[in-house]
Amino acid sequence: MPKKALDSRIPTLIKNGCQEKQRSFFVVVGDRARDQVVNLHWLLSQSKVAARPNVLWMYKKDLLGFTSHRKKRENKIKKEIKRGIRDPNSEDPFELFCSITNIRYCYYKESEKILGQTYGMLVLQDFEALTPNLLARTIETVEGGGIVVLLLHKLNSLKQLYTMSMDIHSRYRTEAHSDVTARFNERFILSLGNCENCLVIDDELNVLPISGGKNVKALPPTLEEDNSTQNSIKELQESLGEDHPAGALVGVTKTLDQARAVLTFVESIVEKSLKGTVSLTAGRGRGKSAALGLAIAAAIAHGYSNIFITSPSPENLKTLFEFIFKGFDALNYEEHVDYDIIQSTNPAYHNAIVRVNIFRDHRQTIQYISPEDSNVLGQAELVVIDEAAAIPLPLVRKLIGPYLVFMASTINGYEGTGRSLSLKLLQQLREQSRIYSGSGNNKSDSQSHISGRTLKEISLDEPIRYAMGDRIELWLNKLLCLDAASYVSRMATQGFPHPSECSLYRVSRDTLFSYHPISEAFLQRMMSLYVASHYKNSPNDLQLMSDAPAHQLFVLLPPVDLKNPKLPDPICVIQLALEGSISRESIMNSLSRGQRAGGDLIPWLISQQFQDENFAALGGARIVRIAVSPEHVKMGYGTRAMQLLHEYFEGKFISASEEFKAVKHSLKRIGDEEIENTALQTEKIHVRDAKTMPPLLLKLSELQPEPLHYVGVSYGLTPSLQKFWKREGYCPLYLRQTANDLTGEHTCVMLRVLEGRDSEWLGAFAQNFYRRFLSLLGYQFREFAAITALSVLDACNNGTKYVVNSTSKLTNEEINNVFESYDLKRLESYSNNLLDYHVIVDLLPKLAHLYFSGKFPDSVKLSPVQQSVLLALGLQYKTIDTLEKEFNLPSNQLLAMLVKLSKKIMKCIDEIETKDIEEELGSNKKTESSNSKLPEFTPLQQSLEEELQEGADEAMLALREKQRELINAIDLEKYAIRGNEEDWKAAENQIQKTNGKGARVVSIKGEKRKNNSLDASDKKTKEKPSSKKKFRK
């Protein structure tokens, strides 16, 4: 192969980087780009005085025509020699390079293993597998003076990357939205022209016109190095004097920031407080791990025995252990004499150090543990957490306990900005630290690991891995918007407008990611809101915003001042994804198999949870993010933005006139003809003309909204977020039973039906979710705060209002089915303060379920606190001791609330029973009145005595009539006295003669009766011979 003169700009850029301790970036295009890695590495070796640079080679699945296995390479060479296709006396430069160079091969999917490590050269292949996250994670492992090499396959034009399908695009496609536009790739290629330390070259090392460093010139040699930093450190070291071990360890540091950080660590070590936390936050390459290593060496010198270190992987601790041993060297410790090093036997850890045993004065141990092994920290005195932002937040919480804790976190790098640590955990630690310092040691707080801890915060600004102002770092931060957190709104000084004066605009993504200077400034402001208001941020979010076809961006802006040409600062940013409109065939196929396709989170999730085949066919929008800057929080801007968004999708911005025509904005895409007619060596790539791009901000009144049925949101459940979405009219339909691994929060899905759409389905789903949530409160949701659980139940009313409440009220029959008579007696006695709380604990689940199921009438009204107590005790099965801590109230007050609510419920049950008896008695009277209406109430017309006398008279009259009937029924003829007038006169004369003396008995002659119908008794009477009757006067 003939030799060719090398373009002088390539070695010049590498030499300048080594001289300024800055990194260089090379993009190599062509099928033989792999072979140029050897030449670039050789140029780097010639420019650096240090040892041969080590290499990190990142790839997706297969290396570019070679293997990383040394024996396989040797066998391949032997086979080729044996077959006669290779000269045994010649060596391939690339194979020689692979043999003598220290190369670490790593899959992209295992890139977390390289955290905390430093390399002289980075090679990135398989461009289609790259993501913003991988770019930030890998490029920042390269030291100052090193080079980054990106290998691209053969291209006719770099604009082919504008339409290249990336691996991550498969996640963005949905059934209704499958056309992905690679806007991020276009912005990435255009940004290379603004990177002064970047050269884009072909596989013959020809510099292409797009290169940002094409005008590079050699720097004049520097005779003297800048030792101002070392002089400052030396002065600090001298000021410490004989202070052991701080003085010796400060001498190992590289920057003044790092030296001060080590001193802060030493101060906490000397205090030997079991409730201290020291947090170290910095960007990548600032020396966090080195400072932690020196701090551990200081802890050993101060007699700490049990020290535990944790990080995502033991391979991330290479730098940390390296500086532990440098600290030992500064303290005159010798290996094998004073300490031993134990390496891991796990092949996946590549012989990483996992334990150090120190036995100089007494037994001391430095032990690596996995982040999940917080249960082994019982005897810990110091726990060190490196790369804390890369560890799930729940695990970090568990690692904090009654011992000294050091933690380091990257706030500007692949983790996005480490916001989960800074916004969640550190904020809680700050608040607890203020409480602890202000009110002393609170007894209740001391029972929690996190409560009552003191917090010291350290930040490192000056980089160590590379020089301050490294151009690759500046380019990467601008490309991925990693330094957006430093942006400050102008409204902080100009005042805030009223929310009603603000307007919502849709952002054109084609213009936003066009790399135009105005668009870039607006993008940085939007990302600053994301970073400042959200704790889950990743560089991949940027590519999701730009490339996902179903996503849309909206911004809330203050009133526009026409005299001011500058774009106003966005107050609120909304990112949403259009979902749904899935074919019935796909729905049935997925439900029958129990699987779901990618994307369309809410349609698939709700269809699966409720086994409904119609919901996924509805069109909807999911709020991916709503970000408001911290200075605008709780001022009504988020509510205003959501109000305008709802109105937009409800069609309230569209004019009712027939003349309305929606404005359609489109951007011309790169065609095949344009690519074929260009040459790579002469191609000039620049930002699109502003006249060909659509407006950055689109008025909602000029756009045709998509036909949607609902707007939904999926978020990690927190009290503040749940309160916001409930206030916006959203109804919960799904709550994940397992907490998220990264944040420890339960995912919640809430929906709101747009005005004018069918809403019965939402009411049915809400009722079903309400019942399921009640049943699950005693299981996975037991750890919820009672107030949060109550708020979730209350939010269901936003959906159940669309259906008629079919819940029947409690009846006496149901009461008898649920409670026995003994249960009601116990409850009544407890409500009268005659029994202890434990006697009725078994009744609380029944009472709570009846109350929250809506069985009790509306007259039973419990205060929110009483409802929380009933829910916590009856549905979550919590104890009074637990509630005492949760509500921050003494137990006697909680029990008093329980007694009050018991009285209200018992009173209601008594009323139901009384009403049931009254209805039973009233039914008899109703039957007697033959279904007539009951007469109106009239007062009594007489007194009680008169009423009694009247009743007695009626009774006597009835008695007489009955007696008369009986008398009339007797035959008296047989007792009649017979005789004529002569006989009676004779009798009277006889009486008169006696004149009252002697017997007054007279006799009258009778007649015999003739009656053929006489009975047998009368016949016997007739047979008697007596014919006279006697009577006494």
From Swiss-Prot:
GO biological process, one term: tRNA wobble cytosine modification
Binding-site positions, acetyl-CoA: 626-628, 633-639, 727
Coiled coil, from the record: none
Predominant place of localization: nucleus
Reaction catalysis annotation: a cytidine in 18S rRNA + acetyl-CoA + ATP + H2O = an N(4)-acetylcytidine in 18S rRNA + ADP + phosphate + CoA + H(+); a cytidine in tRNA + acetyl-CoA + ATP + H2O = an N(4)-acetylcytidine in tRNA + ADP + phosphate + CoA + H(+)
GO cellular component, one term: 90S preribosome
Subcellular location: Nucleus, Nucleolus
UniProt entry tagged with the keyword Nuclease: no
Extent of Basic and acidic residues compositional bias: 1005-1026
Top EC class of this enzyme: transferase
InterPro entries in UniProt: GNAT_dom, NAT10, NAT10/TcmA_helicase, P-loop_NTPase, TmcA/NAT10/Kre33, TmcA_N, tRNA_bind_dom
E.C. number: 2.3.1.-
HAMAP family: RNA_acetyltr_Nat10
Family: Belongs to the RNA cytidine acetyltransferase family. NAT10 subfamily.
Subunit (UniProt): Interacts with tan1.
Role this protein plays: RNA cytidine acetyltransferase with specificity toward both 18S rRNA and tRNAs. Catalyzes the formation of N(4)-acetylcytidine (ac4C) at positions 1297 and 1815 in 18S rRNA. Required for early nucleolar cleavages of precursor rRNA at sites A0, A1 and A2 during 18S rRNA synthesis. Catalyzes the formation of ac4C in serine and leucine tRNAs. Requires the tRNA-binding adapter protein tan1 for full tRNA acetyltransferase activity but not for 18S rRNA acetylation.
Name of the protein this chain belongs to: RNA cytidine acetyltransferase
UniProt organism field: Schizosaccharomyces pombe (strain 972 / ATCC 24843)
